[in-house]
């Protein structure tokens, strides 16, 4: 995969950052890694959920673990449960002189800014957010607006096939990079049919499957037949609602996020309610930059964009629920995005108002 070094996007991304959260559990710690005796250690701090959330955190952990296994290194993680625990969690790893400390998501931006100033020799990686003007911090961001455009095309085509005039979008929280998903999804939908509406629901949490299921029920009851969920653990509830309704004979679909969630939607043999997924290779970013830190080529102070032309975002290689005609349409749009014939927006119409 090829990475593009970009500073132009940093200002846009930073303008999106909204910091803050509220969680209730105490930090949970764990470890994994290569053979005993490895001196290089990567420490990962999550901002919501755990490393088995079937979404973003799990992807990052898989990338770090893969790096550790291949380089005789080790890795540890801590789940910081409140904003008050972010700085202590990062600082605890920095006190151990980690080879790299990885912060997952935009909740941790302010904590990374503070901690990186206190520990100028410690290398930090913040994933899916931007920290500027810190020589010991690398920011990995993704063109999820580009990947979301493609699943927007799939959603709109499925809606038109069913005679529907709207599709659904459920987001965990409107912060950090999250607006990019809605912007790209809406643009993809409108590229197919400008008259199809995107109905948005905000869960205000990434870790409440029951809330996700309730919001999905609301959208499906309104007549929507396809929902794109971008909500971490909350999104698992969206998938569950789709599975339950399919078992009751309703023709509804859900679009996964971050990784291929087809298997999460299986409800009858090998049948799945997951139409497709907006895959974001956070694991590749985590593995790649961990290796750079290990090799002594850590690009401190840089923001690295992983986009569609890098094959870091997009749809899975296999899409059993998409016809060849739909795939052909999606690939056509993909080529236009990569060639810059189509420039995908970073804000939706709703966000612009």
Curated annotation (Swiss-Prot):
Output the InterPro entries linked to this UniProt entry. BMP_lipoprotein, Peripla_BP_I, PnrA-like
Location in the cell: Cell membrane
Q: Which residues bind guanosine?
A: 47, 57, 128, 206, 232, 258, 280
Q: Where is the lipid attached (N-palmitoyl cysteine)?
A: 21
GO CC entries: plasma membrane
Principal place of residence:
membrane
Binding of inosine: at which residues? 47, 57, 128, 232, 258, 280
Swiss-Prot/TrEMBL induction comment: Encoded in an operon with TP_0320, TP_0321, TP_0322 and TP_0323 that may code for an ABC-type nucleoside uptake system, with TP_0322 and/or TP_0323 encoding putative permeases, and TP_0319 encoding a ligand-binding protein.
Under CDD domains, the record lists:
Periplasmic_Binding_Protein_type1
Q: Is-annotated flag, keyword Signal? A: yes
What's in the keyword line of the UniProt record? Cell membrane, Lipoprotein, Membrane, Palmitate, Signal, Transport
Q: How does it sit in the membrane?
A: Lipid-anchor
Q: Which Gene3D superfamilies match?
A: 3.40.50.2300
Q: Where does adenosine bind?
A: 47-48, 56, 128, 206, 232, 258, 280
Which stretch is the leader sequence? Answer: 1-20
The record places the lipid (S-diacylglycerol cysteine) at: 21
Q: What is the effect of changing residue 21 to S?
A: Loss of lipid incorporation and cleavage at alternative processing site
Q: What function does the entry list?
A: Binds purine nucleosides and may play a role in purine nucleoside uptake. May be part of an ABC-type nucleoside uptake system. Has highest affinity for guanosine, followed by inosine and adenosine. Has very low affinity for cytidine and does not bind thymidine.
How is the subunit organization of this protein annotated in UniProt? Monomer.
What PANTHER family does its record include?
ABC TRANSPORTER GUANOSINE-BINDING PROTEIN NUPN, TRANSCRIPTIONAL ACTIVATOR PROTEIN MED
Question: Can you tell me which family this protein belongs to?
Answer: Belongs to the BMP lipoprotein family.
Name used for this protein in its record: Membrane lipoprotein TmpC
């Amino acid at each position: 995969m090829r990475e593009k070094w970009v500073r132009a996007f940093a200002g846009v991304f930073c303008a999106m950052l909204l910091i803050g959260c509220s969680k209730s559990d105490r930090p949970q710690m764990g470890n994994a890694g290569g053979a005993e005796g490895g001196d290089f250690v990567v420490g990962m701090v999550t901002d919501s959920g755990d490393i088995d959330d079937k979404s973003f955190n799990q992807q990052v952990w898989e990338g770090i673990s893969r790096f550790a296994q291949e380089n005789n290194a080790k890795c540890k993680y801590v789940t910081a449960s409140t904003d008050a625990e972010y700085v202590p969690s990062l600082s605890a790893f920095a006190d151990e002189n980690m080879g790299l400390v990885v912060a997952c998501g935009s909740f941790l931006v302010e904590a990374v800014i503070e901690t990186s100033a206190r520990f100028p020799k410690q290398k930090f990686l913040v994933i899916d957010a931007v920290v500027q003007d810190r020589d010991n911090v690398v920011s990995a961001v993704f063109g999820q607006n580009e990947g979301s455009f493609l699943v927007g095309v799939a959603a709109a085509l499925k809606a038109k096939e069913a005679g529907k005039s709207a599709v659904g979008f459920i987001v965990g929280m409107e912060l950090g990079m999250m607006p990019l998903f809605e912007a790209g999804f809406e643009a993809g939908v409108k590229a197919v049919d400008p008259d199809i509406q995107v109905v948005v629901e905000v869960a205000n949490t990434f870790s409440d499957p029951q809330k996700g299921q309730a919001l999905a029920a609301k959208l499906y009851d309104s007549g929507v037949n396809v929902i794109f969920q971008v909500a971490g653990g909350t999104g698992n509830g969206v998938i569950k609602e789709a599975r339950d309704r399919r078992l009751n004979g309703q023709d509804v679909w859900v679009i996964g996020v971050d990784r291929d969630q087809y298997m999460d939607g299986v409800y009858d043999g090998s049948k799945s309610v997951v139409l497709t997924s907006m895959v974001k290779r956070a694991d590749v970013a985590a593995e790649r930059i961990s290796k750079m830190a290990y090799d002594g080529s850590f690009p401190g102070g840089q923001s690295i964009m992983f986009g569609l032309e890098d094959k870091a975002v997009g749809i899975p290689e296999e899409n059993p629920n998409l016809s060849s005609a739909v795939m052909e349409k999606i690939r056509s749009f993909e080529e236009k995005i990569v060639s810059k014939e189509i420039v995908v927006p970073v804000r939706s119409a709703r966000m612009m108002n």
